[in-house]
Amino acid sequence: MKKTKLILFGIILAAFTSTATYAAEKFKVITTFTIIADMAKNVAGDAAEVSSITKPDAEIHEYQPTPGDIKRAQGAQLILSNGMHLETWFKRFYENMKNVPEVTVTTGIVPMGITEGPYNGKPNPHAWMSPDNGLIYVDNIRDALVKYDPENADTYMHNAEVYKQKITATIEPLREQVEKVPVEQRWLVSSEGAFSYLARDLGLKELYLWPINSDQEGTPQQVRKVVEQVRKYHIPAVFSESTVSDKPARQVARETGSHYGGVLYVDSLSSENGPVPTYIDLLKVTTGTVVKGLLDGMSNK
């Protein structure tokens, strides 16, 4: 009798443990880089587990996935990518992900084109740098989660609306910051041409050393072209990005007497303890750095 009770107890315990484990398992989402991951986490809340293939502060254009990346991605039930030729490495990576649906989160965005270099005519992939486009990213992420994890559809739809309100609330303050700078001085000079969408939205004229990070970076011809333009228009500041060398931008500043305004964030978020741990932080910090750099450059002349 005792033995029977013990066996019965063991069966019940095993069933309870199995049920608890199953209940604890969350829908698993993998994203190609940290910015999409942050957006997806805001939409998913506690209903899904979201992680990024690339790490914080990574250069994402020509990232080389590791065996560890592939291992971590195993078991994913959904993959979210940017598209627009951003993740040049992703096609080969995806070959290892059998039967996992992949959703491109830039669907519906009207791309700005790259107008020079070997990528001339291709879409500029940095569409998230427009807060208005950011809202489209969120809608696409929401729709993907609802489609592939319908049990949590209400959660995803509610969280997406809350998050979109937060993004929308940042837009006007960003524009107000830029208005502190005289119109003729509103330039965004950077290493990579990654800020076209932000410059357009905020009324900034754009100038860059190279169009995209997978192109040649900091050649003498690129530096000379920007030096000439900075001198011609008396541009007060130049900037570089967090994932590339600041030497070419500093060289432009040195040769023109322009102010080096600091580091801008675009391709990756920082770690949690860094300056831009979230997408909204990235928009705020990058815009704030541009405005401060321009104003400091004007005061130094």
Residues covered by each model-derived region:
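Bacterial N-terminal signal peptides
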Residues: L8-S18
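Bacterial N-terminal signal peptides that target proteins for export
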Residues: M1-L8
